[in-house]
Amino acid sequence: MKATDLRDLTTAEIEQKTQSLKEELFNLRFQLATGQLDNPVRIREVRKSIARAKTVLRERELGINNG
């Protein structure tokens, strides 16, 4: 998910999205440990999506208006 898409969401929606991404990351890491992961690149994508969401939340806290 792109940062511009995240900026259109409400803070609660972003927090919910972050939580679901964290759960997905947990499941992906579990699959990696058990050798069942088909696409290891997905772990990186999910981590970056979490970082983007946290960045948008932090921008809102600081009052930065990017985008």
From Swiss-Prot:
This is Large ribosomal subunit protein uL29. The lineage of its organism: Bacteria, Bacillati, Bacillota, Bacilli, Bacillales. SUPFAM superfamilies: Ribosomal protein L29 (L29p). It comes from Shouchella clausii (strain KSM-K16) (Alkalihalobacillus clausii). One of its GO terms (biological process) is translation. Keywords: Ribonucleoprotein, Ribosomal protein. GO terms for cellular component: cytosolic large ribosomal subunit. Belongs to the universal ribosomal protein uL29 family. GO terms for molecular function: structural constituent of ribosome. It holds the Pfam family Ribosomal_L29.
